[in-house]
Amino acid sequence: MRLSYILVVVIAVTLQACVCAIPVIKEANQVMLANGPLPSIVNTEGGRLLRGVKKRTAEREVQEERMSGAKLSEKGKQFLKWFFRGSDTRVKGRSWR
């Protein structure tokens, strides 16, 4: 049953791609060349089609991910010290007890 769903989706995507593609014109007359492709297919505004990503923002996100891993490992070390040694290791003013 899953195979039939997969085949239906593949066929639908293929047909959609064929419909949206710009047709190849073997015998082009002047009217067809003057009209060109449909505006719905081609970007008529002249802008970029993809969303730009600022480099600084991406670097900050990567840095935040690195920092969260460091913070998590620090908390894990404190918990393990408390768990095995039984000492009163404090995390932000709270004990593990």
Swiss-Prot record:
UniProt keyword terms in alphabetical order: Secreted, Signal, Virulence
Localization in the cell: Secreted; Host cell
Origin superkingdom: Eukaryota
Protein name as catalogued: RxLR effector protein CRE10
GO cellular component annotations of the record: extracellular region; host cell
Ranges spanned by the short sequence motif RxLR-dEER, renumbered to the chain: 48-66
Signal peptide: 1-21
Domain characteristics, as noted in the entry: The RxLR-dEER motif acts to carry the protein into the host cell cytoplasm through binding to cell surface phosphatidylinositol-3-phosphate.
Induction: Expression is induced during host plant infection.
Task performed by this protein: Effector that is involved in host plant infection. Contributes to virulence during the early infection stage, by inhibiting plant defense responses induced by both PAMP-triggered immunity (PTI) and effector-triggered immunity (ETI).
Family that this chain belongs to: Belongs to the RxLR effector family.
Source species of the chain: Phytophthora infestans (strain T30-4)
UniProt keyword annotation of Secreted present: yes
